[in-house]
C-alpha cells in the first residue's frame, strides 16, 4: 500500500506529458486545420445549392 501514492503520481505525470508527433513531417503533410477549412467550405457550398432548390432536390439548381 505504500507504493500506491507513488504509482498514482507517476501515472499522473505520464498522462499529462506533452504529446509529440513521432512521425517526421514530409512535404505532403497537410495541417488538420486545412482539412477542416475544406470541409467547412464544402458543406457551405452544398447548403447553398440546397437552399436555392428548396426542400425537394429533384433537379439541379438553375434547371427546371
UniProtKB/Swiss-Prot annotation:
Residues modified to 4-hydroxyproline: 60
UniProt subcellular location: Secreted
Record carries keyword Isomerase: no
Signal peptide: 1-22
Propeptide: 23-49
GO terms for MF: ion channel regulator activity; toxin activity
Swiss-Prot/TrEMBL keywords: Disulfide bond, Hydroxylation, Ion channel impairing toxin, Secreted, Signal, Toxin
Keyword Membrane tagged: no
Known tissue expression: Expressed by the venom duct.
GO cellular component: extracellular region
Processing and modification events after translation: Contains 2 disulfide bonds.
Entry's family note: Belongs to the conotoxin T superfamily.
Comment field on protein domains: The cysteine framework is I (CC-C-C). Alpha4/2 pattern.
Function: Probable toxin that inhibits ion channels.
Protein name, entry field: Conotoxin Am1.1
Source species of the chain: Conus amadis
Amino acid at each position: 500500500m505504500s507504493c500506491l501514492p507513488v504509482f498514482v503520481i507517476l501515472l499522473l505525470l505520464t498522462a499529462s506529458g506533452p504529446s509529440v508527433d513521432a512521425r517526421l513531417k514530409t512535404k505532403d503533410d497537410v495541417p488538420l486545420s486545412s482539412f477542416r477549412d475544406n470541409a467547412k467550405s464544402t458543406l457551405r457550398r452544398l447548403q447553398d445549392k440546397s437552399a436555392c432548390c428548396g426542400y425537394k432536390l429533384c433537379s439541379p439548381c438553375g434547371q427546371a
